[in-house]
Amino acid sequence: MVRQQAAAEAIEEDRRFPKLSLGLHLDLGEWSYRDGEWRQVYEMVPADDMVAVEAEILRQIELFRQLAGRDPTHLDSHQHVHNQQPMRAVFAKVARNLGLPLRNFNPSVSFCGEFYGRGKGNPFPEGISVENLCRIIRSLPAGITELGCHPGLDAGLDSDYCAERSEEVQTLCHSRVRAELDRERVTLVSFAELPLAG
């Protein structure tokens, strides 16, 4: 999210690990679920104005380029707005024009969301355990699967999914997980290595 305070620091950290993917998490606004209903926290551009949406996407890509000195390896969006029409078509057009993968757009890539520390909004620590991740690895289908995860180490993050992020880091880096990947002959790849969707 290039408009966030820590963007420059995150990109600087990325330079230490050049093999990692560095995607652009496009931010068009945020909604929060409170007291049984969704409420808008902020909006970058009107969600029903596709010309404004495209212009904002391009602005954020340009800001990413200025900060990183290169294109992102892939695109996605905050709160998955790129999965919903009519925005999906705009995101797809921009990604296609730039030759960048767009998350959840390539039919040859399946998605696994089972590695998550919440279940129906409540804490679910078993979801981010070493045992669960090893089970997921054993049950992966042939082909390419994206594992949805939210690892992080910022204890001061303003999020209701904060402690779980450091647990995810510990689990993802655990030696038993590495051994399971090797045993199941799973090769980790970055978004930069994925085929583009037509």
Where are these regions (language model features)?
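Active-site histidine-anchored catalytic micro-motif
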Residues: Q79
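Terminal accessory/targeting
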Residues: V2-S21, D27, S32-A68, H74, ...
